Amino acid sequence: MSPIIAPPAELVDPKDRVQLRRVFGDFPTGVTVVTVGGSEPRGMTANSFTSVSLSPPLVLICVGKDAVMHQRLTALPTFAVSVLEAGQEKAARHFADHSRPPGVDQFDTVDWVLGEESGAPLIAGAVAHLECAIHRLYEGGDHTIFLGEVITATRWPAREGMLFSGGRFRRFAPDADEGRAA
């Protein structure tokens, strides 16, 4: 074996929030918009979404304790997740913008439908929708981990999901075999 020549590494202090956030951002994720309904609907862009279990069907989302969405999630029994399609960067940026209007007005810039089970807005054109009942909450430092039991799930398999990595929205690269004759 020969020695590996690698670019210089950057040692990161895990107590430095800015540096640690960059390390976390090196992990590519999908992009979702988490929503709640009720008298004051709310949406929030989130990449901290994970499938947990098939039986029972569970997912988790992590929300900062200082976020308005945190207050809404702790007050309601249900939430929804829209897994964004690769072309929905505008929606992702909108629901990450802290200066967007409150309540239902924040949904004026996107097409959406009302979730029948959760009463939460579902972003039209998404790759998938999941409506969830809050199953359990866990402390996670400056975040709360919301475990949701999936009530309904809908997917559009012809759509391609959006990626987020290195602080940027990205798309999947075409498959190397795509377009080749069999």
UniProtKB/Swiss-Prot annotation:
Cited SMART domains: Flavin_Reduct
Source organism of the structure: Streptomyces globisporus
Taxonomic lineage of the native organism: Bacteria, Bacillati, Actinomycetota, Actinomycetes, Kitasatosporales
Keyword Protein biosynthesis among record annotations: no
Enzyme Commission number: 1.5.1.37
Keyword NAD: yes
Any one GO molecular function term: riboflavin reductase (NADPH) activity
Name of the protein in question: NADH-dependent FAD reductase
One annotated GO biological process: antibiotic biosynthetic process
Binding-site list for FAD: 47-48, 62-64, 98
Role according to the record: SgcE6 provides the FADH(2) required by both the halogenase SgcC3 and the monooxygenase SgcC through free diffusion. Accepts only NADH and FAD as substrates.
Activation and inhibition: The SgcE6-SgcC hydroxylation activity decreases in the presence of excess FAD.
Gene3D superfamilies, per the entry: Electron Transport, Fmn-binding Protein, Chain A (2.30.110.10)
Gene that specifies this protein: sgcE6
Domain of life: Bacteria
Family of the protein in this entry: Belongs to the non-flavoprotein flavin reductase family.
